[in-house]
């Protein structure tokens, strides 16, 4: 039977080829199915009619019934506008349009009764409504007298009269074509067991809800299904992998681990570190491949946990590899691990793109013989020329900078897949971790080593620069180092914000006795590394930089970081930057400098940073403020797999619930052969063919 929802959107009444092209390009809508799954972002209650004598300019919305007494065109050029004088018998207001004047004069008539809806404002002492929604009063429908849906649109769509009201009309036309109920996408037993509305009812009520309760049920049904299929896909992938790859069994904790623990451990492990090592040991001895995500703030001791995990692999006769996203971070890990293992008979090597010639050949040869026990490196370890004698443990630092394909490439360097521990200093809220890293078990180091002084965070306005520089000078005199971070490299014509080039000149002039490093993303890697090394070694006292320093610089002597135009940064990025200070024994200060012009959301962000150092608290707040986003901060909202209705920040409880439901199904039907579940696997296949980036979540 033909599924009408697959019909091309251009054949829908009110669309046509021209509008179809706009919908294709602007909203990625190609079929009736795409249109029906383009959900409203809000609803406005239009059940009440007001009288003109009741209204004022502060009301959020008004709805009136009356007539247009007359039209007049005012102004010239861009100021040209159409004004309709509208009355309901109790008073007169102005309806104002700045676009489509010819069209409006052809379609709207004087002395004809209309329902008018919009936001009132006051101009020249008179109440007016700009670009109101208007319907003939004889067409009293659910949308004009109930909950009205509002759809996100673009400027290009509005120019073609495809505003929210226009999309609403297209939705009505699409639903009118559905002579049969929409085919179910969940098995009947799931719909019954979880008291879900049918798909057909849900789609109709999400666009045109008859009442708030039916809207709530429609939203619940569609959120349930969306999150359920995300979790089903992740869990099926994860269970398949566990069945196919049995994994190495590391039951022995031997001489290397015990010697390190008794003689080389630099300080007492925190309770959180002990708990995580116990979880890792349990995984390694289970006979299945470990795939674990280790979360912990900067300075929480993740590297030490990673090293102790690698030593377990060594005790069981296997090699270990640690991969970092940058050469500086890889070199830092190499130096840290060598210091930890000082005096022990463990060979550690560093392999990066910059390691060439005979030294590289020697490392590659000794990896194949097993003489190199621990390899630290960058993407260079993924090259086909790099092989191992017996790779048993892989540590990946800063997971979101490596793709799933790269992770899998490391597995392929062994006959039996090695255990994998993924480390990140980017705190990820539990609900988001469950969705983005559903195939990984999660461990959290949620306490810092004793003796660390909490970083003092201060927000100040940029008119207090003299006192700021005096504080910096005092810190430098006491032998400390300073970071100053800018949002831009060069001056922008469009934005009046501080930039690194001007900032560098200013700082050099302000602190003539100091050596100043300059680091930004457009420098050549060798030049950038050299400047960073000057700061790390203490040769320079001040580093002027962009956010390139958020990962990979460990300078315990740096006690102050100043963030210029802090209002330009997101919470996650700010938290990563703060992790660059507070690494030594001295009190550290983190200073957020802003202008007075701050939005309400920006004020909230800055307040959160001043009030807490807890990365997980900040991550939860970030998720609520701006959506899941891209973990590197380049995409400001939304997630890789483009959730249409569910909200990970607000639907965490439902996410956990559907995960349990999906888990039960995968456990009961691991091979996917039960007839009653056929619809699930068919739907998964269909979803994989859409624009959902399933690879990103599995």
Regions found by a protein language model. Give the residues of each.
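Accessory helical-bundle/CTD segments and flexible terminal tails appended to RecA-like ATPase motors
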Residues: 513, 532-542, 549-556, 561-564, ...
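Short, surface-exposed secondary-structure boundary micro-motifs
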Residues: 67, 119-120, 233, 566, ...
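N-terminal cationic and glycine-rich segments that engage phosphates or anionic surfaces
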Residues: 128-139, 393, 409-410, 422, ...
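Upstream accessory/linker segments immediately N-terminal to the RecA-like ATPase cores of bacterial MutS
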Residues: 74-264
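N-terminal pre-Walker A segment at the start of P-loop NTPase domains
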Residues: 267-277
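OB-fold nucleic-acid-binding modules
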Residues: 38-70
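Inter-lobe coupling/hinge segments of SF2-like helicase ATPases
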Residues: 275-278, 286-607
């Amino acid at each position: 039977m033909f599924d009408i929802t697959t019909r091309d959107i251009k054949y829908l009444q009110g669309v046509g080829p021209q509008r179809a092209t706009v919908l294709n390009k602007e909203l990625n809508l190609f079929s009736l199915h795409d249109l029906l799954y383009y959900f409203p972002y809000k609803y406005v209650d239009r059940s009440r009619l007001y009288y003109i004598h009741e209204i004022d300019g502060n009301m959020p919305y008004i709805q009136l019934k009356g007539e247009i007494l007359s039209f007049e065109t005012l102004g010239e050029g861009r100021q040209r506008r159409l004004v309709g004088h509208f009355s309901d018998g109790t008073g007169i207001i102005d309806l104002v349009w700045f676009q489509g004047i010819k069209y409006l004069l052809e379609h709207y008539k004087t002395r004809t009764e209309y329902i008018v809806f919009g936001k009132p404002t006051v101009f020249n002492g008179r109440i007016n409504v700009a670009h109101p929604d208007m319907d003939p009063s004889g067409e009293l429908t659910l949308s004009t007298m109930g909950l009205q849906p509002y759809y996100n649109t673009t400027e290009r769509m509005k120019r073609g009269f495809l505003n929210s009201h226009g999309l609403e009309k297209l939705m009505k036309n699409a639903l009118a074509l559905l002579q049969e109920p929409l085919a179910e996408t969940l098995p009947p037993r799931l719909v019954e067991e979880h008291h879900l509305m049918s798909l057909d009812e849900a789609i109709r009520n999400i666009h045109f809800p008859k009442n708030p309760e039916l809207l709530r049920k429609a939203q619940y049904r569609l959120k349930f299904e969306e999150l359920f299929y995300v979790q089903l896909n992740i869990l099926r992938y994860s269970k398949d992998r566990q069945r196919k790859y049995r994994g190495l069994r590391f039951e022995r904790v031997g001489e290397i681990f015990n010697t390190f623990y008794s003689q080389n451990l630099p300080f007492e492990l925190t309770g959180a570190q002990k708990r995580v090592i116990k979880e890792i040991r349990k995984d390694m001895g289970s006979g299945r491949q470990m795939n674990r995500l280790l979360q912990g703030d900067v300075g929480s001791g993740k590297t030490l946990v990673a090293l102790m995990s690698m030593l377990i692999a060594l005790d069981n006769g296997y090699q270990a590899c640690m991969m970092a996203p940058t050469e500086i971070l890889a070199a830092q890990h190499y130096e840290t691990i060598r210091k930890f293992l000082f005096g022990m008979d463990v060979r550690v090597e560093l392999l990066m793109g910059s390691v060439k010639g005979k030294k590289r050949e020697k490392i590659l040869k000794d990896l194949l013989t097993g003489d190199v026990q621990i390899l630290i490196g960058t993407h260079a370890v993924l090259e086909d020329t790099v092989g191992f004698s017996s790779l048993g443990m892989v540590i990946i630092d800063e997971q979101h900078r490596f793709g799933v394909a790269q992770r899998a490439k490391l597995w392929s360097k062994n006959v039996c897949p090695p255990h994998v521990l993924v480390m990140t200093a980017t705190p990820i809220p539990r609900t988001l971790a469950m969705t983005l890293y559903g195939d990984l078990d999660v461990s959290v180091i949620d306490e810092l080593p004793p003796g660390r002084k909490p970083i003092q965070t201060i927000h100040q306005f940029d008119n207090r620069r003299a006192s700021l520089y005096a504080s910096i000078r005092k810190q430098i005199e006491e032998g400390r180092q300073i970071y100053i971070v800018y949002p831009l490299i060069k001056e922008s014509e469009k934005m009046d914000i501080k930039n690194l080039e001007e900032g560098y000149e200013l700082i050099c002039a302000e602190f003539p006795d100091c050596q100043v490093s300059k680091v930004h993303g457009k420098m050549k890697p060798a030049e950038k590394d050299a400047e960073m090394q000057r700061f790390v070694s203490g040769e320079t006292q001040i580093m002027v930089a962009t956010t390139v320093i958020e990962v990979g610089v460990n300078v315990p002597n740096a006690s102050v970081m100043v963030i210029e135009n802090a209002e330009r940064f997101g919470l996650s990025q700010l938290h990563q930057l703060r992790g660059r200070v507070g690494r030594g024994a001295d009190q550290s200060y983190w200073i957020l400098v802003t202008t007075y012009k701050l939005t309400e959301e920006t004020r909230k962000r800055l307040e959160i940073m001043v009030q807490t150092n807890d990365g997980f608290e900040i991550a939860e707040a970030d998720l609520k403020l701006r959506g899941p986003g891209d973990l590197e901060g380049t995409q400001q909202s939304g997630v890789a797999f483009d959730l249409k209705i569910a909200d990970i920040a607000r639907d965490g409880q439902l996410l956990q619930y559907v995960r349990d439901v999906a888990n039960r199904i995968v456990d009961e039907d691991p091979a996917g052969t039960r007839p009653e579940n056929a619809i699930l696997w068919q739907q998964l296949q269909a979803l994989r063919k859409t624009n959902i980036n399933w690879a990103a979540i599995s």
